[in-house]
Amino acid sequence: MRVKKDDLVEVISGKDKGKRGKVLKVLPRENKVVIQGVNIVKRHQRPIPQLREGGIIEREAPIYASKVMLVCPNCDKPTRVGMRFLDDGAKVRFCKKCGEIVDKA
């Protein structure tokens, strides 16, 4: 997976198409990601007297990683990501549109 926690991504398909958000959690075994403010679902929660009250709560549900693209911080557009090795041997991600390094992988 080319997406990591705290990356800014944009949804490219589905009901939340066009929304941007920060990656809260990456689930590599399921090939899914949880994004802040995207794919909001309602869950019915029973009250636990010592911990929390019950009711209907809203939270983010995971979506497939293939439905999101990383937003390049340099050109501010959704882009595909490539991998490259620097001269010192460090593996980094780079933007396929502008060629700039996104961050170290």
Swiss-Prot record:
Keywords in alphabetical order: Ribonucleoprotein, Ribosomal protein, RNA-binding, rRNA-binding
CDD domains: KOW_RPL26
Any one cellular-component term (Gene Ontology): ribonucleoprotein complex
GO biological process: translation
InterPro entries noted in UniProt: KOW, Rib_uL2_dom2, Ribosomal_uL24, Ribosomal_uL24_CS, Ribosomal_uL24_KOW, Translation_prot_SH3-like_sf
One GO molecular-function entry: rRNA binding
Complex formation: Part of the 50S ribosomal subunit.
Family per similarity comment: Belongs to the universal ribosomal protein uL24 family.
Cited function: One of two assembly initiator proteins, it binds directly to the 5'-end of the 23S rRNA, where it nucleates assembly of the 50S subunit. One of the proteins that surrounds the polypeptide exit tunnel on the outside of the subunit.
UniProt-recorded name of the protein: Large ribosomal subunit protein uL24
Gene: rplX
